[in-house]
Amino acid sequence: MVVVTANYRLGVFGFFAHPELTAESPHHASGNYGLLDQVAALQWVHDNIAAFGGDPARITIGGESAGSVSVNLLMVSPLSRGLIAGAIGESGGVITPASLDSAERNGAAFGSLAELRAMPAAVVLDRADGHYFPVSIDGYFLTESPATTLSAGKQARVPLLVGWNGQEGSWKSILGDSAPTPARYAAAVQREYGPDADAVLRAFPGNDSAQVKASGTLLASARFTALGTWKWARLAARTGQKPVYVYNYTRSRGDQGAVHSAEIEYALGNLGTNRVYNWTGEDSAVSNAMQQYFAVFIKTGNPHVAGLPVWPANNQPQAPIMIIDVHPHTETPAFAPAFAVLDSLNTLHAR
């Protein structure tokens, strides 16, 4: 296996759209430069990896968090679909990009292109600090929303291994410093969801303190990354005509729980480089299993590992997912109905 990592532009240098940039572009597009960097890197790997012992017909892309969102976007972009043989996404999925028009208005507020080009790069970077530059439907890298492409089955039709962690978010992000009581939880959900609060509370109930913590953590996780990742898996399973393998990573790192990014050291096999934690034999066992599953998927498109529990494809609505922990096992996801409610509300209000 040959591993390639690539850098790409971020922030104002990676996603700044401006009407004057659009006008001078041969593709009549601006913004998404960081994603175009990734396409260029992918094309370079395709053109050159044979010289390093790799196979250009067997390129699997992977990423975590924003990197996972990038994997999703590369799968749906017309610029990169034909370069991909497989994909791995960890804790990041379907997003709702801005329109090019709104991204251009955001950029135009910074001034004219001539004024910006007259500034040193360091000044531009400093002035842009604190501003958000979104991925946009620019008509070139993205021609429509990722959900639309996935719903129509127009994405790269390749095997997909995708999942998220058990504690991507915390109930404290909903309740803040308030005690996790049912009344405070219901009030917080009411403030956030208004007329939809009853539907959310039925899906994520909080009838006692323990349930408030569990449902609040699930809701916060869904709002952060889990829902978008789940939606990616469901849409790809429905339309992609290739197997989709879904996981939920639940191994706690120290006493934090399976927080966002906790799986990275396990998946990449570099626990020993992080000396903050007193890793145990159980941690090593989780890491070994995760590395084997991921490596075999990269090589074959199927994470079947002799001696480990079978990881079934998740191409049916009630298909099981792999729980990655000290003792890997499959479960039918209990959270799926709650996620479906939240997704339907998001879709309703996006119209």
Regions found by a protein language model. Name each.
Residues 304-332:
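Mature extracytoplasmic/periplasmic domains
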Residues 76-81, 255-259, 313-314:
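Short glycine-biased active-site loop of nucleotidyltransferases that positions the nucleotide triphosphate
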Residues 49-58, 114-115, 234-245, 296-312:
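Surface-exposed helix-capping loop/turn segments at secondary-structure junctions
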Residues 327-351:
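Tryptophan-rich aromatic "cage" segments
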Residues 9-11, 62-66, 247-255, 309-315:
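Short, solvent-exposed turn/loop segments enriched in Gly/Ser/Thr/Pro and often Arg
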Residues 115-283, 293, 300:
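Substrate-gating cap/lid region and adjacent catalytic-acid/histidine neighborhood
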Residues 1-113, 140-141, 147-175, 241, ...:
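Serine-hydrolase-like catalytic core of hydrolytic proteins
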Residues 36-43, 69, 105, 226-230, ...:
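A structural signal for well-ordered alpha-helical segments within the folded catalytic domains
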